[in-house]
Amino acid sequence: VADVGCGAGLSTLTMAAAFPDSTFVGIDFHGPSIEMANAAAEEKGLSNVRFEVESATSYQGNYDLICFFDCMHDMGDPVGIAQYAKSQLGENGSVMLIEPFAFDSRQENHAGLGGAFYGFSSFFCTPCSLSQDVGRGMGAQAGEPGMRSVFDEAGYGNFQRISETPTNIVYE
């Protein structure tokens, strides 16, 4: 299992502890976060996980599952990254994407939590994406239509919402 954009590795460490017979690789381009993740794995005594400083288009593998947890909307070239992930999947592999909850239209997202997500997105997510190659600038309220377009453009034949909470949507 690859966890791309893992940051300090909380999601990767959680999965590795829950599934000791599986192997996990946390991937992030931020070196200090990867150092923290490796230290945490050592402290927890987890031998089925490792963390690597890599970009979202440079890691290598043949993965059954590639995860993107709350990070795809921050990436400058989400289509290129989704295409690359597809090239690293095993024969029956899947991508799991978790993104902030958003309704299908901007008008529906202005109140409540959607308004907060727009605020965070304006000051962090969108500038982060725009500073990278391609700079698509999707932001935290891209929603299902935005994410579906990324995976359609990347050549995936299937994209579906599999679960949701008030704060996140899970796609496969």
Language-model segments: residues:
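A short His-aromatic
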Residues: 18, 73-74
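Core SAM-dependent methyltransferase catalytic element
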Residues: 155-172
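A short beta-strand submotif of the Rossmann-like class I SAM-dependent methyltransferase core
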Residues: 68-71
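A short glycine-rich, Lys/Arg-flanked "PGG" loop and its adjoining helix->strand segment in the class I
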Residues: 79-91
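A short acidic, Gly/Pro-enriched loop at the edge of an enzyme's catalytic core
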Residues: 57-66
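Class I SAM-dependent methyltransferase "Motif I" SAM/SAH-binding loop
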Residues: 5-9
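C-terminal alpha-helical "lid/dimerization" subdomain adjacent to the S-adenosyl-L-methionine
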Residues: 98-153
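Class I SAM-dependent methyltransferase SAM/SAH-binding core
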Residues: 2, 12-57
